[in-house]
Amino acid sequence: MPDMKLFAGNSIPKLAKFIAHRLYINLGNAAVGRFSDGEISVQINENVRGSDVFIIQSTCSPTNDNIMELVVMVDALRRASAGRITAVIPYFGYSRQDRRVRSARVPITAKVVADFLSSIGVDRVLTVDLHAEQIQGFFDVPVDNVFGSLILLEDMLQRELKNPIVVSPDIGGVVRARAIAKLLYDTDMAIIDKRRPRPNISQIMHIIGDVANRDCILVDDMIDTGGTLCKAAEALKERGAKRVFAYATHPIFSGKASENLKKSVIDEVVVCDTIPLEEKIRLLPNVRTLTLAGMLAEAIRRISNEESISAMFEH
């Protein structure tokens, strides 16, 4: 069996260290930095010939820098004769640009990034809760999309919930919310119907479902500015919800997210560590982070040992 090696870019060093600890190995010795003109500099400082190499790198903000860092690391490892290279991308940037809207003259940037990674020598991709599952089909290499939402579900099950109801913040999240509701005591589900006048600006219209005197669990794959989430929580409280908890895998938290969450009526926001939090977000009393290190470490171990990934999620 080829020797397994784990390398990390600069996007999520803390999660990378946690994963390495769970696998009882050290992170690979690589210098990943910048030249004086800002160009990316990578040097692999150990032998990787024939090794089964995993590179941990979320392509979060600064998205383009992190993508290029990953790409340059892949090229360096490929030229150093690594046996197999798996890109472990907990958060896949550009995932919301996965389609053309009618006849709009816009790119499908998720496909562009997938083509880029496939063409430079990535043999496999491991990612978490893709915004759109069809993105897996954009790649010319195998993609394992694991479910970080199950880590969130474990936290939900440990709460002392009073008459809970799972709430989808929009029509597009109904499938996700229904799956969580089924696993959460097969509870009821509500849907928030909203209109989005322009990107990152949303207006709550009405709630489909009875949320009065209930603990509401808002579930989504990501939180960006938090505007949608905070307005959803206000609408739920106005309709009589007792408590509102928000769960999301990817904490993008861009723009006015800190201000929005600070003023929000949400009782608690629970996210995963696919993206590092800025200090002003991390210090908010109503934001809590769960780690995916254990899940990702097990997925990496299974890939390296040619074992089933889907078996991790069989109940």
From Swiss-Prot:
One of its GO terms (biological process) is ribonucleoside monophosphate biosynthetic process. Its cofactor is Mg(2+). Pathway: Metabolic intermediate biosynthesis; 5-phospho-alpha-D-ribose 1-diphosphate biosynthesis; 5-phospho-alpha-D-ribose 1-diphosphate from D-ribose 5-phosphate (route I): step 1/1. Binds 2 Mg(2+) ions per subunit. The active site is at 194. SUPFAM superfamilies: PRTase-like (SSF53271). Gene3D superfamilies: 3.40.50.2020. Keywords: ATP-binding, Cytoplasm, Kinase, Magnesium, Metal-binding, Nucleotide biosynthesis, Nucleotide-binding, Transferase. Its main location: cytoplasm. The keyword Metal-binding applies. Mg(2+) 1 binds at residue 131. It is found in: Cytoplasm. Mg(2+) 2 binds at residue 170. Its EC number is 2.7.6.1. D-ribose 5-phosphate binds at residues 196, 220, 224-228. Involved in the biosynthesis of the central metabolite phospho-alpha-D-ribosyl-1-pyrophosphate (PRPP) via the transfer of pyrophosphoryl group from ATP to 1-hydroxyl of ribose-5-phosphate (Rib-5-P). NCBIfam families: PRK01259.1, ribP_PPkin. Belongs to the ribose-phosphate pyrophosphokinase family. Class I subfamily. Homohexamer. This is Ribose-phosphate pyrophosphokinase. It comes from Buchnera aphidicola subsp. Schizaphis graminum (strain Sg).
